[in-house]
A protein has these predicted regions:
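Juxta-kinase regulatory segment immediately upstream of eukaryotic protein kinase catalytic domains
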Residues: 1-8
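ATP-dependent phospho-/nucleotidyl transfer catalytic cores
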Residues: 40, 47-50, 105-122, 135-205, ...
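Hydrophobic HxD+1 residue recognition
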Residues: 208
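Protein kinase glycine-rich loop
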Residues: 15-18
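Conserved small/polar residues in nucleotide/adenosyl-binding loops
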Residues: 229-236
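Conserved ATP-binding subdomain of kinase catalytic cores across diverse folds
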Residues: 20-23, 28, 35, 41-153
Length: 236
């Protein structure tokens, strides 16, 4: 209440959702209505909080502009709105932890188990999300977790794990290792083409699960994509 630019008095904050990276709380007003979502950012994973929040600010502003250009209605339910601190920063640091606040999207829900119909809606929504971000210039966003989606780097880690055999179960998974090796060259095509200057880095969500989006409680149509740990990665 004292640190962020909130428009309503809040009286309680309770755990919300089942995320396993950040700690998320739903924040209610005096009428018992959920108005905000407060998160403690896991800075052990996202070590550059400045970059993380700057990425999110760029992405949400870009999407909001695209929606406005399309003449969309109810835009505040179709893109996350993060609130600045009272000194206009994108997050608050209390000396130990990093915090951010966004508006709660009313009449929304998420799903852990999905039907083919929900999966179809989710696929369309992620496609729209990627399309809206396609014209963000390369170099605009920072890489929040370096090499997280770099398959060449991941294969190096894989080969080290095979060599070290720390768990002593190499003989039990030889068929799986062979399967990965068969696919290794194809897995690294994007990184190779990027190095050769044949493929640009573009903006990907990089965690396109159905439970990373909000659905309208009445129509089951997707409202917006969440968990914007967006970083650039090579793709065509």
């Amino acid at each position: 209440q004292d640190q962020f630019q909130l428009t309503e008095k809040v009286v309680s904050a309770e755990p919300f959702g089942n995320g396993h990276i950040n700690d998320t709380l739903k924040v209610t007003n005096e009428k018992g209505e959920i108005k905000y979502v407060l998160q403690r950012i896991n800075h052990l994973i996202f070590t550059n909080v400045d970059m993380l929040q700057n990425n999110i600010q760029i992405v949400t502003s870009h999407i909001r502009k695209k929606l406005e250009e399309k003449g969309e209605n109810d835009i505040d339910r179709k893109v996350l709105t993060f609130l600045p601190t009272k000194d206009n920063k994108l997050y608050y640091f209390d000396g130990d932890n990093y915090w951010r606040v966004c508006l709660f999207i009313p009449n929304s829900k998420s799903y852990e188990e999905v039907t083919p119909e929900l999966s179809y809606e989710a696929g369309k929504a992620f496609g729209d999300f990627q399309s809206m971000l396609a014209d963000i210039p390369e170099g605009t966003l920072g890489e929040t977790i370096p090499n997280f989606h770099n398959m060449e780097f991941r294969l190096e880690q894989f080969h080290d794990a095979v060599k070290n055999n720390a768990a002593g179960r190499l003989d039990e998974v030889k068929d799986l290792i062979e399967e990965i090796e068969k696919r290794a060259e194809a897995m690294c095509i994007q990184e190779r083409l990027y190095r050769e200057g044949k493929l640009k880095k573009r903006t990907n969500h990089c965690d396109t699960k159905v439970n990373n989006m909000m659905f309208d409680t009445e129509t089951d149509k997707v409202l917006c994509v969440c968990l914007l740990y967006t970083s650039p990665s090579p793709r065509d």
